Structures are given as C-alpha cells and as structure tokens.
Amino acid sequence: MTPPSYLETNEAIFYEKIFNEFGKTQKEVEQYVDILRKWSEKQSHWPEMPTLNGLLYCILVSKFSIENAKKRTDMYYTIKGLMPEIFTVHPSSPEVIKHSEIAYCVPIPKPTKSHERIFYVQLNPDYNPEDFKIELFFIQITHMVEVIIQEDKCYNFHIIFNASGIKIGHLARTHPMVLKKMSICFEMKVSRNSDVLFEAFDKSLLPTDIGGEGLSLKELRLLLLKEFERMTPRFDRLQTMRTDESLRPAELQNDDTLGYYGNFKKLDLD
C-alpha cells in the first residue's frame, strides 16, 4: 500500500471553504467531477484516465466552468508532447536533485488556517549564479505542481519568493520578459523584510531560515525529495506520456441554444 502524501489537508475545512467561496456542497462538487470524468472517458487520444483528484483540481481552478475544466484537463496531457524537454526530466535525476539544493522550491506541508497552500522559493546563497539554471528551475516547478494536482486538497496558493539569495549574476541570466510575465501572472507584493510574512501567515508555518517556527529549507527539500521517491511510479509514467493526436475527437462545437458543450448538464440537487 502506497503511504500517504506528506502534504497535510483537512477535507472538512476544504469543502467548507468551497461552499463559502462557490456555494457548492460536497455532493455538488462530486457531481461536477463525475461530469468531467464521464467526458474524459471519451477522450481516446489521452494516454490514461485522469485521477479523481486531478479532475477535482481542474474543476476548482476553473471555478466550476466545465468547459474550462475540459480545456485544462486536455492541456495537462497535450503540453507534455509540446514541451518534452521539460516533461521528460525525472525529479530523481541527478541534475534535478542537485538543482533542488541550488534553488529551493518547496510546498509547506501544513496549509494555512484558511486551507491555502504556501510555496516557498529561495536561491541558496552558498551557490554562484552560474550554478543556477532557469530551465531546471521551471522543471522543479512542474514536478511540484504534479504533486499538488495528484495529492493535494488545496486550490488557493501563496508563493513566497525570498530574494535574499539573488546576486547580480542571477539577473544577467534571466531574460527581462520572464520577469514581466511573472508580474502579469501573479499578484505580487514586495517587502524589505520578513516581518510582513509573520503578519500574513502563522509563524509556525514558515521556515526557521527566516525566523519562522516550521521546518528548515533543507528539511523541506528532503521531504519533497522523499515525496518524489514515493511517487516514482507516477513520474516514471510521465516520461513517455503523450497524446495520440490521430485519435483526437472533433473539436467540440458550442450550441446556440445550449451554450457551451457540457456546461448545462443536469445536476441532481436536493
């Protein structure tokens, strides 16, 4: 039997949060997931049937839009063939293990009181800028996201980027457009010290490296590496996971009367 993930969740709080934010009960959430599951069964070009947690994740980040959830789920598989240089790199490969020490990129095991996941990112000041590889950093992120999709019960996230380890050489190795895209994709707040973090998050969650009372970055890194090891069968499978475009169904057509395909499936609600 596969041991559970080290990411802590509370399903009661999880579904309470969904109800407060979207007005959906657990039963309704399960019905949405079932709609997406039944549609997924017809996608013969996919290399596998998505996990229920993966379908749930797509539903939540799509804010219960079935149409958008379909697109996200399909892209999850399609992108692996479009970017093989990213998705064929195993988290247990020596280069990734080494780079995880150069650039810390870790989820905090315990969620916040409002059941949101914190990701902590920091460059290790013990390494030189030339040791940092932006491609491997992005690969680290995809590995972490895979863990979240398959194992987590959080759908709101906070990314803490500690810039204390950044040197001039790092900036020279990062294209300005990458920084611009980051500012567009994420709502960013900048602070000169960690005091603002202690105001926003429980001190027990944050790494000891910045004065928190949680685990150290080294300990968090080792936990994530163990999680990758636990999920070895999954990451082994991802190495060759590709869509068969010759089997892709015709693109879904929206109906003038019914609207987006699948968005208005009847839900059995009490």
Name each model-derived stretch:
Residues 1-270:
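Basic, amphipathic alpha-helical/coil surface patches used to engage anionic, phosphate-bearing ligands
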